[in-house]
Regions:
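Intrinsically disordered, low-complexity terminal regions
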Residues: 1-230
Length: 230
């Protein structure tokens, strides 16, 4: 088991790149701590924003992802001059301060819980964001499960290769467009001030405690559930 830690402060920007599965948990600390049992190695370091390049993970000759890393522009904040970058060739776990802002890339699965900043996540297979404050951008090649407090943008699009479960707790005024295995449907919550497009290779489940109104031309609604009682 390889382990590394670095002093990061209470609200760091952390970029995590893993060749396989990655689990991320928020905790009460000013350290970013990572561990992996894989043979692909582990690196953790502070980098200037001008140094951050491509996120690339591969298994053999098969490239899982190869994308340019653009640092997110956090609302009300300047782009940080330094970021913490964690890289591992295989699977592992990363602990980050509760207030972290994250960009996470993984060749297979991503599981993030208990983060009070913004999270952007790109998974080759499954993606799960639970008890996250702010949802940025997200995509997955397989199943996606989202449970966040708010979103960073007013117009968003999320795509999953399989089932997509979507719950944003403060979504009280939005126009929802969904395309999944059952076809296309459109609905409105409140005054429809935000725009949310959900595209899935499986079934989409919209989780909300708000009234959902079906819209023309078909006045069809898909799968809608109320959140579980806390």
């Amino acid at each position: 088991m390889t382990q590394r830690s670095i002093l990061a402060g209470k609200n760091p920007t952390v970029i995590i790149k893993a060749g396989a599965n990655i689990t991320v948990r928020g905790y009460e600390s000013d350290l970013v701590s990572a561990e992996t049992s894989g043979v692909g190695g582990l690196q953790i370091e502070k980098r200037g924003k001008s140094e951050v390049g491509r996120a690339r993970a591969a298994i053999g000759d098969h490239v899982l992802f190869d994308v340019r890393l653009n640092l997110p522009k956090w609302k009300g904040k300047n782009t940080p001059e330094e970021v913490i970058e964690v890289q591992m060739g295989g699977s592992g776990q990363v602990l980050v301060p509760f207030g972290s802002n994250l960009k996470v890339y993984a060749g297979t699965d991503i599981d993030v819980q208990g983060v009070q900043g913004q999270v952007d996540a790109y998974a080759g297979l499954k993606l799960s964001l639970q008890d996250v404050y702010c949802l940025g951008y997200a995509s997955s090649g397989g199943k996606m499960e989202i449970d966040c407090q708010t979103m960073s943008e007013k117009e968003v699009k999320f795509e999953a290769g399989s089932d997509l479960r979507f719950h944003v707790r403060d979504l009280t005024s939005a126009r929802i467009r969904v395309r999944d295995l059952g076809g296309y449907w459109e609905a409105r919550i409140g005054d429809g001030e935000k725009s949310v497009y959900l595209k899935s290779g499986g079934d989409v489940t919209l989780v909300t405690d708000q009234k959902v109104e079906a819209l023309p031309p078909n006045y069809v609604l898909g799968r809608i559930e109320r959140p579980a009682a806390s």
